[in-house]
């Protein structure tokens, strides 16, 4: 353990359009090579497209989609004796958000639509309806944790 002081977490500024800190964080997740203005165009374009496609308010749609993707449990590898067990552990709230955002962006990048904004919009609409690749990823993680419930006593 280092003897220096513990560095506090940075406060993220809310995004300028909707005033949401979660959305500002999401823009940072979408961003590639430090190109934030392009990431903002993609996210805001996706929100507009998703809102027009589903007929819901953009920010509410985003919140519902994230809520449907957030995992509650995950598995972590734990070495005991000579074998490695997949131990189910609960996910911290900050990590839940981070994983949900990451999975949403990964699923969007694998889609077939023309632009990233349209891919993201499609994935947002699917996630808000509890379908799509990102929701499938969450279900897979939950299924994995459920299958390894027997090793839950190895938690640390």
Swiss-Prot record:
Share an example GO biological-process annotation for this protein.
translation
Q: Which UniProt keywords apply?
A: Ribonucleoprotein, Ribosomal protein, RNA-binding, rRNA-binding, tRNA-binding
Q: Which InterPro entries match?
A: Ribosomal_uS7, Ribosomal_uS7_bac/org-type, Ribosomal_uS7_CS, Ribosomal_uS7_dom, Ribosomal_uS7_dom_sf
**Which Gene Ontology molecular-function terms are recorded?**
rRNA binding; structural constituent of ribosome; tRNA binding
Q: What does this protein do?
A: One of the primary rRNA binding proteins, it binds directly to 16S rRNA where it nucleates assembly of the head domain of the 30S subunit. Is located at the subunit interface close to the decoding center, probably blocks exit of the E-site tRNA.
Assembly information from the UniProt record = Part of the 30S ribosomal subunit. Contacts proteins S9 and S11.
Q: What is this protein called?
A: Small ribosomal subunit protein uS7
Task: Name the encoding gene, please.
Answer: rpsG
């Amino acid at each position: 353990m280092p003897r220096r002081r513990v560095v506090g977490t940075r406060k993220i500024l809310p995004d300028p359009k909707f005033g949401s800190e979660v959305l500002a964080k999401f823009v940072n997740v979408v961003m590639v090579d430090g190109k934030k203005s392009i990431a903002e165009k993609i996210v805001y374009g996706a929100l507009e497209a998703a809102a027009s496609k589903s007929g819901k308010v953009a920010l509410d749609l985003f919140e519902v989609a994230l809520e449907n993707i957030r995992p509650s449990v995950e598995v972590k590898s734990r070495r005991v004796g000579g074998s490695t067990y997949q131990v189910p552990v609960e996910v911290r709230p900050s990590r839940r958000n981070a994983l949900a955002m990451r999975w949403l962006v990964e699923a969007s990048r694998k889609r077939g639509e023309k632009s990233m904004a349209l891919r993201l919009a499609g994935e947002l609409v699917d996630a808000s309806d509890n379908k799509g690749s990102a929701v499938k990823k969450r279900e897979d993680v939950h299924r994995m944790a459920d299958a390894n419930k027997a090793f839950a006593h190895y938690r640390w």
